[in-house]
Amino acid sequence: MGYSHEEAEHAAKPDPRSVLPFRGGETAALARVKHYLWDKDCLRVYFETRNGMIGADYSSKFSAWLAHGCLSPRYIHAEVKRYEKEREANKSTYWLIFELIWRDFFRFFCLKHGNNVFFLGGTSGRDWQVLLVP
């Protein structure tokens, strides 16, 4: 099981097509939070840019670190609250926290319901039907 040495070596090389070359681990995750919130002040305009896909700073790009446990939603929340005290509270700070809450909701929802979230009957187990609305 696992990767061969060649596969692992290839996977470790940065992909030139990547907007943001991810580096794993807590140190890289904390550096990203610092960069995004404090160095570049991207949080100030997060609401306007959050759905952009191409640029390195359009969205927070915290997902990979959150998913792997290198970064906690609690830490991000605390940093956003500190940002609100030291810089400003605005629609962007609200939305970053709001989306962290949604992330946790769906994470725990999927833990509770497992693969049922992917079945046609969904979590309720009801048969799927086409509703024709004129």
Identify the residue ranges that each predicted region occupies:
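Glycine/tryptophan-enriched, flexible segments
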Residues: 1-128, 132
